[in-house]
């Protein structure tokens, strides 16, 4: 007979839980939040310094060279090299993520993608499988995931920009998984140093790389702390940060694993 364990153990310091659900917003940030809520995306300028761009490019190249032909890292990016870690709580981005999702946030996934010359257009897709209602549930729940892309190469018509359909995060149906152009799509030509954040439920896709060079991106995605994460939050680098990092870093790395 199965023996029930009635003990409930909290194995984290409850001080890492924010005292307020939502941060105070100034007029500029409030305007950005309203834009994101309406259109489902936001372009953040000066999200990375020149030195950070150089460091990321060097680290990205070194990491994928070791992977020998692999073009995707789907999760646990921070475990591949500690030089990726500053993206975890990068201030210009976290400021906007908290403004939109509230203070109780964690990483949904930390990934990277190398699109080599000859890669094809992606089909249109959403990143989440949950159904959508723009009004949420009566209590206010809504599947909330925000993707943040740091593009390490200037996006052009040749190497493949990002295509989105602004406002489609509110659509009640998924997009057709096909390669075609929406009449109201928007093409984003991201620049190194910018961060492109977008709702995981917006219709989006990466276009094919017709250039002679690789296209490189790091993707750090966020959600509320009470949602399931793709990350394992294990491994030596993450374990060290969960032990000795800041309260925000611990929160972002899933330290509040039960309540």
How should each PLM-predicted stretch be described?
Residues 109-112, 148-150, 218-222:
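A structural signal for short, well-ordered beta-strand segments
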Residues 43-44, 148, 196-198:
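Short hydrophobic-aromatic micro-motifs
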Residues 2-21, 195, 202, 207-259:
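Non-heme Fe(II)/2-oxoglutarate
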Residues 1-39, 43-138:
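Non-heme Fe(II)-dependent double-stranded beta-helix
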Residues 119-190, 227-234:
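Catalytic core of non-heme Fe(II) oxygenases with the double-stranded beta-helix
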Residues 155, 201-202:
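Short Ser/Thr-interspersed hydrophobic loop/turn segments at strand-loop and sheet-helix junctions
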Residues 186-201:
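Short, conserved beta-strand/loop elements in beta-sheet-dominated catalytic cores
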Residues 81-84, 183-184, 205-207:
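Active-site rim elements
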